[in-house]
UniProtKB/Swiss-Prot annotation:
Compartments where located: Cytoplasm
The organism of origin for this protein: Deinococcus geothermalis (strain DSM 11300 / CIP 105573 / AG-3a)
Any one of the GO BP annotations: regulation of DNA-templated transcription
Main subcellular location of this protein, as a coarse class: cytoplasm
DNA repair among keywords: no
This protein's record includes keyword Cytoplasm: yes
Designated name of the protein: Probable transcriptional regulatory protein Dgeo_2194
GO cellular component terms attached to this protein's record: cytosol
Amino acid sequence: MAGHSKWAQIKRKKGANDKKRSAIYSKHIRAIQAAVRSGGSGDPAANLALKNAIAAAKADTVPADNIENAIKRAVGAAEGAADYKEVTYEGYGPGGTAIFIEALTDNVNRTVADIRAVFNKRGGSLGNSGSVAWQFEKKGVILLSDTSEAAQEVAIENGAEDIQESVDGLEISTAPNDLYAVQDALSAAGFKPESGQITMIPSNTVAVNGDDARKLMALVDALEDLDDVQNVYTNADLPEEVEA
């Protein structure tokens, strides 16, 4: 993920070409299978990590059949199957932006080397653990195209912490543990969330424009192209024409 607007991120991924979309799907399949192994269950009702992985996959329009098959393969996987580890990295990008990266890897040395190489090539720098993590908060985020007061009331009554309205719809923020309660309440009230997932939200944003904005997006794109990288978050407030 890149930039500040979650709606812009959804549009970018939906508009990805076939090669890029295939890579996005592969990352989600890996995350789902790792969640099954780490959580010890193929049932999302009994495995929160799997439930979160499925929600993230659905947000990126991964087909239901792909998700189901990934779970089945992970449940039946042999003991010798690759054991992936969740790791995070932090760094700085053009315009003084903070970058937080989530990765899933079976070789940490390879992953950190690949990430450092991208930062060095694209005008950024890899930081130490804790250098920028404090600038982000883990939150649940629900996107809803319906901007009615009724929808907002349902969200607030069921635990929403913040609601941002734009031309695309509502971006509803929740505590991580309240995500599914709010999403289920909206669905039960007849509203249809576009997506709902756990993500990292910047506490404050930095306006980035012009050449710095283009360089930042090139850096984020290059990081997202790495097989081990699952998510890339920045605190950048980017112009719409750059995020698109």
